[in-house]
């Protein structure tokens, strides 16, 4: 008589395809997943609690270390929240530098995802190509901020440094170069029949499920929901740029892949326009009080990060330190749908599905 037994399989917390200290407990029957339980918290550092004992400007370096693949957007959301509370006006030149930094960071983040995702699926070459192009972006951001990963570049009221001489020209030159490479990526991978067969119909969820799980960013837009805060609730100077919001209808790994690749092209469009509109001169810091104290009250702001909506809630009692600081981290919310996606799937699809969601554990754990 044929008999099967359920097996418990641990993926991680030290596993190359979890891209961080993440553990996934799988209950499997043969090759079919019966239940998936994510275990998080290995990288928890208590950022929000630490922030309660710091002045607002001292918190900025901690934001670099949440989503360390898109540190610029983390810098921005905190500064934007404090500026909103205090009514600080940011100079135009500083806003353009912020947008350029964030969009370059968005492309760099998507390149890391693209290279590692294909590596997880068994393709080595795309990983090398992605990091070749990412290195060019990191060098540009290094020239701008003095750092390669944890930039600590943005300041409440502006930015730390002005663009060095010739930096805007280098960014302009990067745009056509990246477009050419992006076309090569599509030839190599996107149109590859083996790749498309591997990810089509895998890890599918509906628009209604995406909304009920509070998914955002690409993970939401891949189900046909056209929602991007840069368009729908413009901040900084995003309302001055002409760009599209890529959406797909499939809600599967392929749809998420195509959305991210299309987003790289839109970021290039924004960068191109920002370089053309870049103010010839002007200050990079607004007028600030000598000591930054947010007035008593609370505020919540949200922006579009590479992994979705990142939000910052501040409750102030009028002191130099926040009474309470809370970040809405998109990776944390996006990860919640993983058990639903994995149930009933083949074991071989675990890494394909996890990689398509694109989480960063520093952001998940906080």
UniProtKB/Swiss-Prot annotation:
Enzyme class: translocase
Membrane topology term: Peripheral membrane protein
Location(s) in or outside the cell: Cell membrane
Record keywords: Cell membrane, Membrane, NAD, Quinone, Translocase, Transport
GO terms assigned for molecular function: NAD binding; NADH:ubiquinone reductase (non-electrogenic) activity; quinone binding
EC number, as in UniProt: 7.1.1.-
Record SUPFAM superfamilies: HydB/Nqo4-like
GO cellular component: plasma membrane
Catalysis performed (reactions): a quinone + NADH + 5 H(+)(in) = a quinol + NAD(+) + 4 H(+)(out)
Pfam families noted in UniProt: Complex1_49kDa
Domain of life: Bacteria
Record-stated family: Belongs to the complex I 49 kDa subunit family.
Function: NDH-1 shuttles electrons from NADH, via FMN and iron-sulfur (Fe-S) centers, to quinones in the respiratory chain. The immediate electron acceptor for the enzyme in this species is believed to be a menaquinone. Couples the redox reaction to proton translocation (for every two electrons transferred, four hydrogen ions are translocated across the cytoplasmic membrane), and thus conserves the redox energy in a proton gradient.
Quaternary structure and interacting proteins, as annotated: NDH-1 is composed of 14 different subunits. Subunits NuoB, C, D, E, F, and G constitute the peripheral sector of the complex.
Protein known as: NADH-quinone oxidoreductase subunit D
